[in-house]
């Protein structure tokens, strides 16, 4: 038939035309997807071009070995530090903020504390050395104190023992007294103090105590002042110098002259010698 739609030719198979139409439709769809992809890509490039630039800080360029004490990479290598800095510079994108930079260690923002490390044996040696110095100082102080005490003791022994407080008894008196020899510097003051102790106070005595105070040292008086030395011997007071008397006296006794006559005759020559020596001086 001449009118109407022309049918397939005799040489063409019946499904060839339909396949050709499907190929044209698929190629058209691919072209549309390609155009869509190109347009989206150009938009992303424009957004990246208009995005603000971020300045890298020291935290971004910090070496990876310094962030982790257990890392096997040495922080002293300049090549490793440069590589780590380059990776950190290229890693964050334009959309990331400085506070959201990824880190491989939770303590990446802190430096290594206690670097360089001190070995344990060095720390122990320093501690032991300080301890030895302290002990030596204490030993020297103790030795100095002991030497000072020993010196004081030797000086005291050289000067002689000071009697201090000694007992005083008087014939006819039941109760004794004590007197401090360190409070006196001569026999006269000692005799006056003993007379005031054992004699009842009266107006006449107070008026004439300067004259009566020497009676204890006089052989013609009613009472005589005697003392017992360290050897246990009884002697008359006034035979030896005052310093020797103070260092050797053990106790005092006010004896009656009749009882002390033996002591007076025994040491009569000594009294005469002392009296002549005092007269010459």
Curated annotation (Swiss-Prot):
Compartment(s): Nucleus
Pfam families in the cross-refs: AUX_IAA
Major location category of this protein: nucleus
Segments carrying motif EAR-like (transcriptional repression): 36-40
Domain PB1, chain residue ranges per copy: 163-259
PROSITE patterns membership: PB1 (PS51745)
Top-level taxon of the source organism: Eukaryota
Annotated region described as Disordered, given as residue ranges: 1-115, 130-157
Biased composition (Low complexity): 7-17, 36-49, 63-84
Entry GO CC: nucleus
Basic and acidic residues: bias regions: 133-157
GO aspect biological process, one term: auxin-activated signaling pathway
Listed Acidic residues bias regions: 18-35
Keyword Transcription regulation listed: yes
Keywords in alphabetical order: Auxin signaling pathway, Nucleus, Repressor, Transcription, Transcription regulation
Stated role: Aux/IAA proteins are short-lived transcriptional factors that function as repressors of early auxin response genes at low auxin concentrations.
PANTHER family on file: AUXIN-RESPONSIVE PROTEIN IAA11 (PTHR31734:SF6), AUXIN-RESPONSIVE PROTEIN IAA17 (PTHR31734)
Family that this chain belongs to: Belongs to the Aux/IAA family.
Subunit-level organization: Homodimers and heterodimers.
The protein, known as: Auxin-responsive protein IAA10
Gene: IAA10
